[in-house]
């Protein structure tokens, strides 16, 4: 049953804002939608606490909660992905009880044992990133009054994890395999790896080297990255800076000529500029490659719906032609352009990023639930017959209608708000949060849904991914919380940079 509230374990105060003449469901909705800005951080904490309580009650110590069936699931090695992914958000929200629960859990993880094949990419961004971020946020900060010994365990566990993962780089090129059998220290034997799965390791592994004074971790990821920075053959770099999505592990050569900012490619480009934020002096080449990719994206992948020329999306390039489709996953791109524009003092990148933010906002604003779909298109030649009027009105049609609590649209709203100061983007974040809360809440958490363009989101599909804690709730909270070292600055040098799982990593001094 659809809940029209965001009442978590500590949000009874919200009901007091309701009009007594309205029924309970209505007044809870009004209370959430109409909260004053100063009350919004607590409402977001309440959402976190509601989901956390459900996880701890029904799923701990498994990876994730199924918030409809109230069961646990282990899609991420069975080490408790939700606690590790939630740690940095709990620190930022100032939730000491949750932080201490998570620190106790982490101390018990044995990373050498798992019954499942492991993704190097997912394990790096969620577990390794979560551990390093927790350490960066807590070490010598006095935050949460955390036990210093428990804080030190975070770095110890990060080293343990990297040590059981590093065999993945044992190829003739140093390009890692992604699918690993950790107990046997073997790979699945795949001959290729993806652009993002190779190119989204360098921040976490480099930071681990900096924290431990052991160069090997960063060198492993940076050696693999060199093949992405110097793509061969050049024919598979379809436009300057934009490369294909698959690379041969044994030869280091790209296997196809394509380009996109979608899943599978996305966070490679994201990390190019973020490594420059991490250390401008050491990663200038990464920045140069990002600039090439950004310029080529504007020139070759920018696209607008026929009837909505003021709407801007980024398409993909395949088989020598522009593909007019995109994904929720790709909607991080607006924030990445905004970050790059601010970092490089290149206002043309910031302006383009804001156009992308506006385009992705329209995928939310035009659906029944006010949540954007998993994937969408705008090719006037491929409009589904049952979406003709929707396409005319909105400028896009829905290819995949589900929503799995993804953060990317809110993430880009956050960057837009922090860099411009325009409260419009803050309002858009709150609108999205209200819509997600209204549509996805269950008695024990928040659930993925089947159809963003159907009443009540269609059906609840029983997944609460760990990134809902790490990313979706964090970016929402940050937009309404006070200035802090981990916030993106409007200008100047950031003290932290977010990994692709929204874990704040302290930049080099």
Swiss-Prot record:
GO CC, any one term: endoplasmic reticulum
Superkingdom classification of source: Eukaryota
Pathways per UniProt: Protein modification; protein glycosylation
Annotated localization: Secreted
Single Gene Ontology MF annotation: mannosyl-oligosaccharide 1,2-alpha-mannosidase activity
Residues linked to a glycan: 170, 399
Class of this enzyme: hydrolase
Residues annotated for Ca(2+) binding in this entry: 500
Signal peptide: 1-18
EC number of the protein: 3.2.1.113
Substrates-to-products reaction catalysed: N(4)-(alpha-D-Man-(1->2)-alpha-D-Man-(1->2)-alpha-D-Man-(1->3)-[alpha-D-Man-(1->2)-alpha-D-Man-(1->3)-[alpha-D-Man-(1->2)-alpha-D-Man-(1->6)]-alpha-D-Man-(1->6)]-beta-D-Man-(1->4)-beta-D-GlcNAc-(1->4)-beta-D-GlcNAc)-L-asparaginyl-[protein] (N-glucan mannose isomer 9A1,2,3B1,2,3) + 4 H2O = N(4)-(alpha-D-Man-(1->3)-[alpha-D-Man-(1->3)-[alpha-D-Man-(1->6)]-alpha-D-Man-(1->6)]-beta-D-Man-(1->4)-beta-D-GlcNAc-(1->4)-beta-D-GlcNAc)-L-asparaginyl-[protein] (N-glucan mannose isomer 5A1,2) + 4 beta-D-mannose; N(4)-(alpha-D-Man-(1->2)-alpha-D-Man-(1->2)-alpha-D-Man-(1->3)-[alpha-D-Man-(1->3)-[alpha-D-Man-(1->2)-alpha-D-Man-(1->6)]-alpha-D-Man-(1->6)]-beta-D-Man-(1->4)-beta-D-GlcNAc-(1->4)-beta-D-GlcNAc)-L-asparaginyl-[protein] (N-glucan mannose isomer 8A1,2,3B1,3) + 3 H2O = N(4)-(alpha-D-Man-(1->3)-[alpha-D-Man-(1->3)-[alpha-D-Man-(1->6)]-alpha-D-Man-(1->6)]-beta-D-Man-(1->4)-beta-D-GlcNAc-(1->4)-beta-D-GlcNAc)-L-asparaginyl-[protein] (N-glucan mannose isomer 5A1,2) + 3 beta-D-mannose
Active-site residues, record numbering mapped to chain: 374
Textual note on the cofactor: Ca(2+). Can also use Mg(2+), but with lower efficiency.
Keywords: Disulfide bond, Glycoprotein, Glycosidase, Hydrolase, Metal-binding, Secreted, Signal
Disulphide bridges, residue numbers: 331-360
Function summary: Involved in the maturation of Asn-linked oligosaccharides. Progressively trim alpha-1,2-linked mannose residues from Man(9)GlcNAc(2) to produce Man(5)GlcNAc(2).
Subunit and interaction comment: Monomer.
Protein name, UniProt field: Probable mannosyl-oligosaccharide alpha-1,2-mannosidase ARB_00035
Species of provenance: Arthroderma benhamiae (strain ATCC MYA-4681 / CBS 112371)
């Amino acid at each position: 049953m659809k809940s029209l509230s965001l009442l978590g374990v500590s949000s009874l105060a919200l009901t007091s804002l309701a009009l007594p003449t309205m029924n309970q469901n209505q007044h809870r909705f009004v209370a959430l939608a109409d909260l004053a800005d100063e009350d919004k951080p607590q409402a977001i904490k309440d959402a976190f606490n509601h989901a956390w309580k459900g996880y701890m009650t029904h799923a701990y110590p498994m990876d994730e909660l199924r918030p409809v069936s109230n069961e646990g699931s282990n899609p991420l090695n069975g080490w408790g992905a939700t606690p590790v992914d939630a740690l940095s958000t709990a620190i930022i929200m100032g939730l000491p009880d949750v932080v201490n629960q998570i620190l106790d859990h982490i101390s018990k993880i044995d990373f050498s044992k798992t019954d499942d094949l492991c993704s190097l990419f997912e394990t790096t961004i969620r577990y390794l990133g979560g551990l390093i971020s927790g350490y960066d946020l807590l070490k010598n900060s006095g935050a949460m009054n955390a036990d210093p010994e428990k804080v030190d365990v975070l770095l110890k566990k990060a080293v343990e994890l990297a040590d059981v993962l590093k065999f993945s780089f044992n190829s003739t090129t140093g390009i890692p395999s992604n699918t690993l059998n950790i107990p046997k220290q073997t790979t699945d034997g795949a001959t290729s790896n993806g652009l993002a799965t190779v190119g989204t390791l360098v921040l976490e592994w480099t930071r681990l080297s900096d924290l431990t004074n052991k160069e090997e971790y960063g060198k492993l990821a940076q050696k693999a990255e060199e093949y992405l920075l110097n793509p061969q053959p050049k024919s598979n770099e379809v436009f300057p800076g934009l490369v294909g999505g698959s690379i041969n592990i044994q030869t280091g050569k790209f296997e196809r000529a394509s380009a996109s900012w979608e899943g599978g490619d996305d966070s490679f480009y994201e990390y190019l500029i973020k490594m420059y934020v991490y250390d401008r002096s050491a990663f200038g080449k990464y920045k140069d490659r990002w600039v090439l990719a950004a310029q080529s994206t504007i020139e070759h992948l920018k696209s607008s719906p026929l009837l909505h020329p003021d709407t801007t999306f980024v398409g993909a390039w395949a088989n020598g032609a522009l593909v007019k489709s995109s994904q929720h996953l790709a909607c991080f791109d607006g924030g990445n352009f905004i970050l790059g524009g601010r970092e490089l003092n290149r206002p043309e990148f910031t302006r383009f990023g804001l156009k992308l933010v506006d385009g992705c906002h329209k995928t939310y604003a035009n659906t029944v639930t006010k949540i954007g779909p998993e994937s969408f298109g705008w090719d006037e030649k491929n409009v589904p017959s049952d979406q003709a009027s929707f396409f005319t009105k909105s400028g896009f049609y829905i290819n995949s209608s589900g929503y799995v609590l993804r953060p990317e649209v809110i993430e880009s709203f956050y960057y837009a708000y922090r860099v411009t100061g325009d409260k419009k983007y803050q309002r858009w974040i709150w609108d999205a949060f209200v819509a997600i809360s209204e549509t996805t809440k269950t008695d024990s958490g928040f659930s993925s849904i089947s159809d963003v363009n159907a009443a009540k989101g269609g059906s609840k599909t029983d997944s609460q991914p760990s990134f809902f804690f790490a990313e979706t709730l964090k970016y929402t909270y940050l937009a309404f919380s006070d200035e802090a070292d981990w916030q993106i600055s409007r200008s100047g040098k950031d003290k932290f940079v977010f990994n692709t799982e929204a874990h704040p990593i302290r930049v080099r001094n």
